[in-house]
């Protein structure tokens, strides 16, 4: 079984994780889940198309790939369709979310969750104390 980790740009959704940090996160995930990483694939900076891994998949036939987060998946519809078409049979693991799965439905659900998260309103925690943030949370639950 061929398993690969994929590093991408430092900007991963709401996170900023340099490639060495991404490698540490994915290697830790692989170790905890008894996965043996056989390839490390760096994607180009400023790209979330995952084109390099798709190109290599044509020759290497990966069974599993590990990414840090669902936020590394493509956003543009044509890139999403290319990824699904080329890698629908591959098992995707997302280390930060702790989820894995394969197929069109799984990937589309991950992309939907990432999009929903990115549209969520953020609270400027520098303008509020922890007590104010806690009160805001409790008020929302009422």
Q: Positions of the model-derived regions?
A:
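Short, structured surface patches at the beginning of a domain
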Residues: 1-142
